[in-house]
């Protein structure tokens, strides 16, 4: 379509559709047709008008006019329109399918009607008369779309009147449509038979609907129109002010503008009406040419708005904030949220908006929407500013308090608007900010100061963390970032910065400082820069030194050595000549050594030469003084001085003995006399020859010396030289030694004499001992006579004493008899005491009989009496032991789940270890990579799994302390509770996904959701899911009964996998382990049922025994093989053995039906019943074969074939089954499979037909086994669980699920929600609406969003959280909720239990009617206080609901009143009957008491079961640990082999008595260049390579090498070279790499060099 003019080029009016030209005569039918076409055209114009108006309001394109009706059916555009004029009613978030993706994919959905309803509610909110409203079905079902367009037109006029939207255009006659489009619309209108609404009467209807006095309003509007025609502004304004016109916001200064605008509007309307009436026969309306009240008000608002905008623009130009605020308050604009205190903010924001608008090329003033946006932005900015000030104040207060965690918490406050803060660096923030705060003049940091400081400190924190983890890239990125604020960063010094920072970090740790500060980092950078600069200057200085040496001038050499940049130590001017001699000699030696005449000395060589020269000078001076002292001592005649001088270490004389001091002195004095006899030349100089071949000149007068020969030098003739002195000493010492040799033998004679004297003494001692031994009999006789005499005398004395004391003896006897009598009495008493326990037992037996009778009454009686129930009601209390058992149970569940995940992760890592060891053998990876992975395995990943579950305190994470995150957390808890307790959703979801995706989903999410069935509740719910899913699969997927056997049903696979894992592993082990172990231990058992195999084994055996080749053919058919008698014999033996061992397996299986997990048996029952329901004609045998396929073939058979893979048997690390053992087990499994399916051996296996009869007999046993296995109770009977169990359990269910699993589940539910829950009011739709769109991993964890390809994202997705599941739709005890009969019953029973415990009575009615005594009330209060104390100690996951806690605070009387209220409601609901005194409730309480006992028993059994599972998992972890040890020993062997092959040569003296040291290799760059290893060094000529040395040293870590570079002896840099990185580069085909960012090396040749020198390969 296109816009067209009303008049053609000739000025003739153009006919419209339906018009009749003057020369045109039409029939009645043609006129009707033309009229229908005109109606269609007019409606299309209205559609175009509505489309353009909505586009202006929404700011987005709508579908073409001919498709607009269809595009409005989903209500999205209508809902967006509702949001435009009433955002409070219609939120964008509540618009269903806002982007219309679902509509485009699947068409209309019933929930699209929500959008239409929201639009209608929005119109109702603003007050549009309901006479214009369409029905929902008019739009959704397209029953009356013109009604919708009519409503949009009315809405546009109404909004124009309110000043909320622009006026809709009148496009009649101004747009063109094709003939086809008009005909299509005509057909569409005729199809539905729709009566076209009167669009032209909208204004009048709207005025009538909104007015009180229609006649007065009509007259006032006509008067205004007449005044407009007169074009007198004063008259028009007077008419407008008529109260009956109901016009508002009139401003007299704008009267002339009102007149102009209204006059123009009326002229336009009259023109449009004229065009329309020329081509229409319908009845005209008075308002077709007159302006309606709404149009008048709309134009007034338009003028007011324009005027207000002009005033605002003027205020902005003048920069007057007060005038701007007054202009913004104009009612015509209707701006919301204006606050006078924010006037300056409005001025700033609107000036900015205006400037931006002008920059974009728009010069018109800011419009109303832009002003509102600016006001909102300014209010927000002002509010943020105030909040920011408050947050900054809190931060300063927290810094002053000195609590690092509190400071970081305040810094992380979003209202502070600070850069990102990292909690792990809390101490760093506290320390540095506190320092800055103290330095601040006002001791408070401003927001800009905090922003800069936090930004820099965060960067420093990241640097610290990167240094700890060794992340080099992150360290450099932060160092070079402008955010960090470091200065003088040089990229070429990058590696040095990193090395120094690593050392600084290590030093900080050693000093117990967790972080290095910004100042530390800046100082480190400055230090490195200084060192680099000094190195450069030092190299230049070394060059100057070498040049001076070549010139041969000692003074120039001295000046060069004294250059400060060289930093040479110990340079002395007086040693200049010796420096020259020493260094030039060293330079020549180096040139000869490397055969390069241009060789130069390096720094360490020059420094060494200086130190050596200084040392030589000191030693020469001491030597000269020592020789002079000897001469002086000899001349003085003092023997002591002479000996002391001779023994001085400075002169280096040997063989000096103190005993020969006088002889030395006399001999030297004699030598002196001989020199004197020759004559004295009186020279003051002496020349000494010193080590190194140099002469040292010593002045005897000044006692100084030097290396330079003095002018006119003459050697002093009187001084003894060292050689002369040494010669004299050697002669004297030799003579003394000969004399002492004789004196050395005196000790031998002394020792000989001592031995002789000792012999004589020993001989005398032995003689005395022999004499005494001969006299022993006589000595013994004398001693015995003496003892006998003494004993007889003592006896006689005792008899005499007793005879003299007879009275006393009688008294003693009487006392003894009394003691005996008393003892008999006491023994009798003790007898009674000893039998007190028997008496107590008798009494207890009587009491127990009474209690047993009461308990039998409680258990068996239909209506147990109140008295009996009251005795046992205390059993309903939760004791400390109950709480402890619940805590133990929760802890054990968590540990089991953690251990399951740990073992799974460990198993995956072990598999990866297998692969890496295999690659190691193929030289694809380095040994060190395997070693590092091995170290990782030893931790068993428990720490990692534990850390993954600690997400709760991350900033912005799912468990962050904010209302938004709390709502998100609760929404997920509600969702997963619904999924867990309603199996229909997951059962349908499984079959909505592809096979591979559903399997992964089940393995991860479903088992996690049910905590791997770690307790009774979760096992019950999981089995419900299995049951529902299996029934769904059979119903929708299975067309033939054999598909269960031939296919791979999803649910069956999941059930078998679950029950064969950790949960059913013990069962399989108990059933199969004994017989499997027996088979494996029988080494003689060899089952072969293939005749060809038997034949080949026989032939091989004959050839091995005879040593000759057999004449029999090797390749034969089974028939040919069976032709040999030996083969038949061996086959019969194998069959007998196979039948015997198979029978053992069969007996073990059929006798262990009770050991099979209940879940496995229950699913077998469900499978049988479901198949029978779908295939009623299937026989019993056919169904049992399917059950056999499940219980035996899928569940047991794999464990028999591969017992090692299913932990049926234990193998040592590295151990495995032999081929014969596997073949034996495979043959047995095949037999059992044939027996379970009643399949005979035929065809190719005809030679086994002899055991077909045995198979038939075995099938009958299997048949009875399968029938028994299916005979199990239903879930509710087995677990005693129903839909109300969660309302009374002590603890809330908790699951541990990863972030990735949460997001995956959320995504799948959104994608398939219509399939799994087709009903619109299904609860899951509400829960998914609560959650909204699928969140990102980062938003749930609390990390900042990063790169989509971030490799850490996968690790983040595995982070686990715990969700405490709750039910949103049934909250017991909530007073504001509608409580059903069950909830009221539970609450009432709980209160009754509390009352009857403390108040006795025969019936409940009697107790409720009898007032409680004060003693009963006091006892009740004490009990409630004890309960409150116990509840306070209860963990959050076990706390009771709020209403239960409130009930505990009631008195007995209040509780009785609440009970009576509950009983009244229950009576009305028909739950209880007051005629029998509410005996039903007493019976329910009795049942609860019985069930509480069963629950405790189940809990104990569950705890035992979990402990067994935990032990089994620990055993499996131990096995994995053994595998780890096995791998480590293998790796150690590889390392030992590698080390033993290394070609590290050692000198003999190093090999003997010393530990071997790490060898280091030194190469010049020139040598490496010759070998091809070094390609080039940037900025260095090849002829300078000889001055560069590379030193390669192995580190403590295998495969790591430290490479040091020196230039002219100056230590430049150190580079860590990783052998595994080299291999990786080689594997990737990288031929060249850089060292030190400058030296390019050949990767392959470098690997070859390292292998050759360090690994010997």
Curated annotation (Swiss-Prot):
List each copy of the Calponin-homology (CH) domain by range: 44-159
Keyword DNA damage recorded: no
- Modified sites of kind Phosphotyrosine: 172
- Domain WW: where? 679-712
Q: Which residues carry this modification: N-acetylserine?
A: 2
Q: Where is this region: Disordered?
A: 1410-1448
What is one cellular component GO term in this UniProt entry?
cell cortex
Q: Where found in the cell?
A: Cell membrane; Nucleus; Cytoplasm; Cytoplasm, Cell cortex
Keyword Phosphoprotein applies: yes
Q: Where is the composition biased (Basic and acidic residues)?
A: 1417-1448
Q: Which UniProt keywords apply?
A: Acetylation, Calmodulin-binding, Cell membrane, Cytoplasm, Host-virus interaction, Membrane, Nucleus, Phosphoprotein, Repeat
Region C2: which residues?
1276-1657
Superkingdom of the source species: Eukaryota
Where are residues bearing Phosphoserine located in the sequence? 2, 330, 1441, 1443
Q: Name one Pfam family in it.
A: CH
Q: Which residues form the Ras-GAP domain?
A: 1020-1269
PTM characteristics: Phosphorylation of Ser-1443 by PKC/PRKCE prevents interaction between C1 and C2, allowing binding of nucleotide-free CDC42. Ser-1443 phosphorylation enhances the ability to promote neurite outgrowth.
From the UniProt entry, list the residue stretches annotated as the region C1.
956-1274
SUPFAM superfamilies per UniProt: Calponin-homology domain, CH-domain (SSF47576), GTPase activation domain, GAP (SSF48350), P-loop containing nucleoside triphosphate hydrolases (SSF52540), RGC domain-like (SSF143885)
- Job of this protein: Plays a crucial role in regulating the dynamics and assembly of the actin cytoskeleton. Recruited to the cell cortex by interaction with ILK which allows it to cooperate with its effector DIAPH1 to locally stabilize microtubules and allow stable insertion of caveolae into the plasma membrane. Binds to activated CDC42 but does not stimulate its GTPase activity. Associates with calmodulin. May promote neurite outgrowth. May play a possible role in cell cycle regulation by contributing to cell cycle progression after DNA replication arrest.
Domain comment as written in the entry = Regions C1 and C2 can either interact with nucleotide-free CDC42, or interact together, depending on the phosphorylation state of Ser-1443. When Ser-1443 is not phosphorylated, C1 and C2 interact, which prevents binding of nucleotide-free CDC42 and promotes binding of GTP-bound CDC42. Phosphorylation of Ser-1443 prevents interaction between C1 and C2, which opens the structure of the C-terminus and allows binding and sequestration of nucleotide-free CDC42 on both C1 and C2.
Q: How does it assemble?
A: Interacts with CDC42; the interaction is demonstrated with IQGAP1 in GTP-bound and in nucleotide-free state. Interacts with RAC1. Does not interact with RHOA. Interacts with TSG101. Interacts with PAK6. Interacts with TMEM14B; this interaction increases IQGAP1 phosphorylation and induces its nuclear translocation. Interacts with SASH1. Interacts with PJVK. Interacts with SLC26A4; this interaction enhances the chloride-bicarbonate exchange activity of SLC26A4. Interacts with SVEP1. Interacts with ILK; the interaction is required for localization of IQGAP to the cell cortex. (Microbial infection) Interacts with ebolavirus vp40.
Tell me what this protein is called.
Ras GTPase-activating-like protein IQGAP1
Organism of origin: Homo sapiens (Human)
